[in-house]
């Protein structure tokens, strides 16, 4: 993208972007929630669509001049429906958190009970954390993973649901490397009269590619981000497999009296004007482009390689003596428990940064360290796979990470990090990000 104008007008902002471009191209991105969008997606996000206010929905806006942004939003909606097989979709949420907020606000009242995976066990802030709206406006109860297996015990989930009787159960995670049994979750939800929401922000691309089970057939609501494994712009989305009458009994007047609103009507109104105003039409245009890319055969090949790389890397880590929470991975990420390496997550993150490898410190289940220190790191393969890296690189990267972590207390750690950084730079040079240049 031409940056000559920006460089001349605002050298400081230009420099920050240039430096970030260099960081992305010359270092290895292993944060599980990050990826590289295509230049086509970035071009749509940087287009004139950013100038247009479009409160409302296609064909029913509060502003004039929306005929062309309507085209973009309809393309995004139609492509998302085809990609995931949903009857309803709202592509306007600004983020995954916004999407989750819209669902919770549309079917719950303040003080209602919800259940979600504990944040310290791999859940997400919006699934009931006490520092988040979801744990402050609603009575949140958290289920966790088994101390021995590191996996969710559905029997314990059922026991908690029977005791708590929540109005909504949330299945989803930000640091859980196994799958969710949404059929079992739905059976539990039906038993206690709860609604079921799947948050697939992390594995959405793998689900779209048909590599992981689609939760739409079991869940009342499915939310996701549009970046991460979907490789689109930063944003959110809400889907329903099929529409149904809203459970709160909200009605709408008709010519002959009134009727109960469909859930799609309630959800649309909750997104706008409920929690948002004008949608980000340039981002929605970028979402449309990304969904179009995800519908191509090449995306399925990409998603399959993401999982192969994660599995290969996890296996190599275990060969090197690392503990992976839940014993391995069935998606795009893994959570390394570093307690047997005598290194904290914070220390590992900082040392790996010096070595040109970006990961994030992460709490492990039953962690005795704070979220600012942690006992683990989270590693994901979406971004490295976008660069074209495969199993050979996955194995070597695990070995390089091991070199750094096992040398943490050595006096020559700086030299070791520098040597690893040079090899990482070579690996990245041999696997460039298509269309990116410093």
UniProtKB/Swiss-Prot annotation:
Modified-residue entries (N6-(pyridoxal phosphate)lysine), positions: 228
Record's keyword annotation contains Ribonucleoprotein: no
Gene3D superfamilies with a match to the protein in the record: Aspartate Aminotransferase, domain 1, Type I PLP-dependent aspartate aminotransferase-like (Major domain)
Site (Plays an important role in substrate specificity): 227
Superkingdom to which the source organism belongs: Bacteria
Keyword line: Amino-acid biosynthesis, Cytoplasm, One-carbon metabolism, Pyridoxal phosphate, Transferase
Reaction equation(s) it catalyzes: (6R)-5,10-methylene-5,6,7,8-tetrahydrofolate + glycine + H2O = (6S)-5,6,7,8-tetrahydrofolate + L-serine
Molecular function in Gene Ontology: glycine hydroxymethyltransferase activity; pyridoxal phosphate binding
Predominant localisation class: cytoplasm
PROSITE patterns given in the database record: SHMT
Gene Ontology CC entries for this record: cytosol
EC number: 2.1.2.1
Keyword Nuclease applies: no
Pathway: One-carbon metabolism; tetrahydrofolate interconversion; Amino-acid biosynthesis; glycine biosynthesis; glycine from L-serine: step 1/1
PANTHER family membership: SERINE HYDROXYMETHYLTRANSFERASE, SERINE HYDROXYMETHYLTRANSFERASE 1
Family: Belongs to the SHMT family.
Description of how the protein assembles with itself and partners: Homodimer.
Official protein name in the record: Serine hydroxymethyltransferase
Gene: glyA
């Amino acid at each position: 993208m031409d940056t000559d104008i920006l460089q001349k007008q605002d050298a400081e902002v230009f420099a920050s972007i240039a430096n970030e471009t260099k960081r992305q191209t010359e270092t290895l991105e292993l944060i599980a929630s990050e990826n590289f969008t295509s230049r086509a997606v970035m071009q749509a996000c940087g287009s004139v669509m950013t100038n247009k206010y479009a409160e409302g929905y296609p064909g029913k806006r509060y502003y004039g001049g929306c005929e062309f942004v309507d085209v973009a939003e309809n393309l995004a909606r139609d492509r998302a429906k085809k990609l995931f097989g949903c009857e309803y979709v709202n592509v306007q949420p600004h983020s995954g958190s916004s999407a989750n907020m819209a669902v919770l606000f549309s079917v719950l009242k303040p003080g209602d009970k919800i259940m979600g995976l504990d944040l310290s066990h791999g859940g997400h802030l919006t699934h009931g954390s006490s520092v988040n709206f979801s744990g402050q406006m609603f009575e949140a109860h958290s289920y966790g993973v088994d101390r021995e297996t590191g996996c969710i015990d559905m029997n314990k989930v059922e026991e908690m649901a029977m005791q708590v009787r929540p109005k909504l159960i949330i299945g989803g995670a930000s640091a859980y490397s196994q799958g969710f049994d949404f059929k079992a979750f739905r059976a539990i939800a039906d038993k206690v009269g709860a609604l079921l929401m799947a948050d697939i922000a992390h594995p959405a691309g793998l689900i779209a590619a048909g590599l992981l089970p689609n939760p739409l057939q079991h869940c009342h609501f499915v939310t996701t981000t549009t970046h991460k494994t979907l490789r689109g712009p930063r944003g959110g989305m809400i889907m329903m497999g099929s529409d149904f009458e809203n459970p709160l009994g909200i009605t709408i007047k008709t010519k002959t009296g009134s009727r109960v609103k469909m859930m799609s009507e309630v959800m649309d109104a909750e997104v706008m004007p409920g929690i948002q105003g004008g949608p980000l039409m340039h981002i929605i245009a970028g979402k449309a482009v990304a969904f179009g890319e995800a519908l191509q055969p090449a995306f399925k090949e990409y998603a399959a390689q993401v999982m192969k790389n994660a599995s290969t890397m996890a296996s190599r880590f275990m060969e090197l003596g690392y503990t992976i929470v839940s014993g391995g991975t069935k998606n795009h990420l893994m959570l390394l428990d570093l307690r047997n390496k005598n290194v904290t997550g914070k220390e590992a993150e900082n040392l790996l940064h010096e070595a040109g490898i970006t990961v994030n410190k992460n709490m492990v289940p039953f962690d005795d360290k704070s979220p600012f220190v942690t006992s683990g790191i989270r590693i994901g393969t979406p971004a490295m796979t976008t660069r074209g890296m495969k199993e050979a690189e996955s194995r070597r990267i695990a070995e390089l990470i091991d070199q750094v972590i096992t040398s943490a207390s050595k006096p020559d750690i700086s030299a070791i990090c520098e040597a690893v950084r040079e090899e990482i730079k070579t690996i990245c040079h041999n696997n460039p990000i298509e269309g990116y240049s410093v």
